[in-house]
């Protein structure tokens, strides 16, 4: 059926773009080859989407079952019976076998759950497993922690599903843009002007075939935005360069950077003076603009650094606060902050270490909380740290409601930050939506030029 559709599409393109049979054969061979790559990318998208849905069902079933049974092995058995046949069920079966058949290890459950974590790289799975392992070994009230994890998971699921829908919608728009550009390019060849037909021109034929090739490659590129790993799409970078961004921002020295900017501005300033002296005013204006940019490059760079840093911090802070909220269920705030360093986003690592050091010196003071990330002056973070301090001192004797409010605000912050990050990651699809316009415009310009030349030749004759 696929090959019949390709033959039909090729014949339509042959008629629409007035392709000769040689170019038609080239287009047919190209489309037959490319359909293999399109099929592979389509399958990868379906697999990535299924992996996400499997993980979503796994976390839900696991946590609800653990709340009911309060035993890891029983929770996993319930998950296995719920899942449909597939890779996730096979992985859960291997984890259960490890639990049942291993007798010489002290952390059997942890090692068994790591089997699933290695197959599905997802922070929500790790958080659920760590919560279950802690509850299994140490006991305690698990309802509140499970509720936090389930709320976070539900918000995460909604974000990713919404992002998948956005990507599919934008991909369909790319296809529509391609179809429209090809149709418009074909219409030009049917303009009834003096019976002039430029379609037989070799340049027009080559450009028509090239248009089809480029537009198909645009569609293939668009498919790359669909086949991403949706389990890790919202993960933050963990490299050393990312870890040092906050320290580099704090180390900014305006006086030193100004001196560097002045040195950079000397050459374009001298060039501007020389151009004015030689009465070349427009080049002099361009040189003046370059000098002004060089003179202010340190300010521009610092503002861009702050903008990017704020975006990263707004994504990292709610993730750290979520881990903190889980730890607070069984620890006091100061101990929870110390333990949270194990999974903290790298961009906050040094700042949290500084917070711990300040709390060691002033455990009852609000100053360490208020000085956290004070260099960025973000109201939402300041408010969250103020609430955290109130919880630490047990203000008003109602810590439960304060923690609930903290979690609610944190989930809102996380939703806004991650939604913005996911939207930024699909920005390239908008450029692909515009790409067929560029290819079609170029072909139309060349076609009109050839038409004009043919028209003038016709008039001369």
List each language-model region with its residue ranges.
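Junction motif at the cytosolic side of a transmembrane helix
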Residues: 219-250, 300-305, 452-458
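Long, solvent-exposed extracytoplasmic domains/loops
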Residues: 87-133, 146, 351-359, 365, ...
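Juxtamembrane/interface alpha-helical elements of multi-pass membrane proteins
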Residues: 22-107, 237-256, 269-272, 276-359
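Hydrophobic alpha-helical segments characteristic of transmembrane helices
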Residues: 60-79, 117-166, 174, 226-241, ...
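Membrane-interfacial helix-loop-helix connectors in multipass membrane proteins
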Residues: 17, 108-117, 188-207, 277-283, ...
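Long, mid-chain structured domain cores
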Residues: 19-24, 28, 45, 86-90, ...
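Alpha-helical transmembrane segments and their immediate juxtamembrane interface regions
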Residues: 204-229, 284-316, 381, 391, ...
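Bilayer-spanning, highly hydrophobic alpha-helical transmembrane segments
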Residues: 3-9, 151, 157-220, 264-270, ...
């Amino acid at each position: 059926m696929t090959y019949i559709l390709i033959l039909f599409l090729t014949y339509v393109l042959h008629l629409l773009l007035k392709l000769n049979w040689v170019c038609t054969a080239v287009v047919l061979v190209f489309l037959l080859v490319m359909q293999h790559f399109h099929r592979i990318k389509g399958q990868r998208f379906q697999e990535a989407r299924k992996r996400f849905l499997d993980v979503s069902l796994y976390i839900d079933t696991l946590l609800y079952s653990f709340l009911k049974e309060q035993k890891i092995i029983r929770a996993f058995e319930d998950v296995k019976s719920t899942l449909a046949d597939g890779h996730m069920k096979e992985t859960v079966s291997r984890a259960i076998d490890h639990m049942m058949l291993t007798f010489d290890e002290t952390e059997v459950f942890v090692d068994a759950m790591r089997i699933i974590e290695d197959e599905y790289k997802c922070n929500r799975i790790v958080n659920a497993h760590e919560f279950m392992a802690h509850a299994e070994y140490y006991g305690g009230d698990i309802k509140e922690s499970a509720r936090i994890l389930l709320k976070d998971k539900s918000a995460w699921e909604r974000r990713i599903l919404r992002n998948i829908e956005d990507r599919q919608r934008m991909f369909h728009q790319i296809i529509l843009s391609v179809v429209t550009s090809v149709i418009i390019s074909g219409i030009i060849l049917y303009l009834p002007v003096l019976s002039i037909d430029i379609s037989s021109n070799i340049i027009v034929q080559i450009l028509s075939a090239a248009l089809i090739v480029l537009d198909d490659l645009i569609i293939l590129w668009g498919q790359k935005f669909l086949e991403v790993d949706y389990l890790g799409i919202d993960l933050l970078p963990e490299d050393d360069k990312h870890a040092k961004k906050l320290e580099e921002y704090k180390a900014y020295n305006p006086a030193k950077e100004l001196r560097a900017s002045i040195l950079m501005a000397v050459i374009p300033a001298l060039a501007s003076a020389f151009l004015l002296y030689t009465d070349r005013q427009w080049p002099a204006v361009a040189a003046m603009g370059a000098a002004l940019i060089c003179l202010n490059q340190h300010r521009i760079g610092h503002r861009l650094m702050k903008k990017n840093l704020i975006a990263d911090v707004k994504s990292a802070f709610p993730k750290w606060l979520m881990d903190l909220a889980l730890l607070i269920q069984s620890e006091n705030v100061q101990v929870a902050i110390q333990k949270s360093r194990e999974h903290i986003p790298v961009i906050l690592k040094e700042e949290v270490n500084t917070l711990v050091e300040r709390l060691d010196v002033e455990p009852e003071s609000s100053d360490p909380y208020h000085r956290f990330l004070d260099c960025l002056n973000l109201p939402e973070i300041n408010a969250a740290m103020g609430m955290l301090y109130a919880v630490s001192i047990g203000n008003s004797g109602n810590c439960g409601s304060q923690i609930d409010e903290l979690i609610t605000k944190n989930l809102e912050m996380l939703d806004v930050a991650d939604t913005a990050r996911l939207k930024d990651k699909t920005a390239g699809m908008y450029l692909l939506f515009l790409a067929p316009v560029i290819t079609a415009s170029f072909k139309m310009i060349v076609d009109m030029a050839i038409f004009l030349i043919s028209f003038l030749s016709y008039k001369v004759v």
